[in-house]
Design a protein with these regions (language model features):
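Active-site metal-binding motif and surrounding structural segment of the metallo-beta-lactamase
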Residues: 1-42, 48-50
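Sec/Tat-exported extracytoplasmic proteins
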Residues: 2-7, 24-30, 34, 56, ...
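Extracytoplasmic/secreted cell-surface and envelope-processing proteins
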Residues: 18-22, 61-64, 130-132, 178-180
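Accessory terminal helices/loops
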Residues: 32-35, 159-166, 175-266
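Metallo-beta-lactamase
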Residues: 42-191, ...
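PEST-like low-complexity, intrinsically disordered acidic/proline/serine-rich tracts
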Residues: 34-47, 58-60, 99, 133, ...
Length: 266
């Protein structure tokens, strides 16, 4: 519900600028709460802004030198509190809140935020309704990890009795959703991944896989030929991951040459 009370915490679900770029401004509009024994100037400083919470990998990524041509992230957008491991849990306004780390998915620092009593999940970019999964390999993302994260969302969501509604799912981009929307997105991601994996096992090149159009039946809903994340980029990213997962067997001639070399050296 909406309240006039000051914001106490900002949760950064991952490292991307469109999700952390407002951290400093929002934090300055809020106040955190210090312990009862923190008084005077120290206490005032400790409560002057809202806390910014993120997984430790977000802080690690922000602390690295930015890519060429990009400005460093302002220090005020950095998390002030980080957590290690799988999750952080706390009570807030009488409600249990879980911040759950999903590794190696969209990035390596993604978190879900689950409000248990309200039955609301904020997913960050681990789920969207407007595009194919963005796998940021430069920041530790993988397709297999992304699908695992979608399954993790489904582990904590429930439908209502007509299979629509139930747990409210707040995506990183797009409309408010429910469990059924996540199921459809998870199924799409799994089908496309499995198609490309099978093509890789057959020894197809990237261009041959693209010619097969493994996303064709989903393109009207999620596809794009323009922008920072195109359908072609999505396919190529999965292809490269599947090649690492299923490396091509050495050519017979090369194997024979290696065996001969071993024999001559004996």
């Amino acid at each position: 519900s909406v309240t006039d009370a000051p914001i106490r915490y900002v949760v950064s679900t991952h490292v991307h600028g469109d999700h952390i770029g407002g951290n400093e401004a929002i934090a300055k509009a809020g106040r955190t709460r210090a312990g009862g024994n923190v008084v005077g100037d120290i206490g005032a400083a400790a409560t002057a802004t809202a806390g910014i919470i993120a997984h430790e990998n977000v802080l690690k990524r922000l602390s690295m030198d930015p890519p060429a041509g990009q400005k460093p992230v302002p220090f005020g957008d950095f998390p002030t509190e980080t957590f290690f491991g799988d999750k952080r849990e706390f009570l807030f306004n009488g409600e249990a809140v879980q911040i759950i780390h999903e590794p190696d998915a969209h990035t390596d620092g993604d978190s879900l935020v689950f409000f248990r009593r309200s039955d609301v999940v904020a997913t960050g970019d681990l789920f969207t309704t407007v595009m194919y999964p963005f796998i940021d390999t430069a920041n530790g993302g993988t397709m297999n990890g992304y699908i695992k994260a979608l399954n993790a969302i489904l582990d904590i969501t429930v439908p209502n009795n007509v299979n629509e509604g139930g747990t409210m799912v707040v995506p990183g981009h797009g409309r408010l959703s429910d469990e059924q929307d996540v199921i459809e997105y998870r199924d799409m991601a799994t089908i496309v991944r499995d198609r490309i994996r099978e093509y890789v096992k057959r020894g197809m090149t990237l261009e041959q896989v693209k010619a097969k159009k493994p996303t064709l039946d989903f393109d009207p809903r999620y596809g794009s030929d323009t922008g920072f994340w195109t359908t072609s980029m999505f396919v190529e990213t999965i292809y490269k991951e599947m090649v690492k997962e299923n490396p091509p067997a050495p050519a017979k001639g090369n194997q024979r040459n290696r065996n001969q070399s071993k024999g001559s050296g004996a």
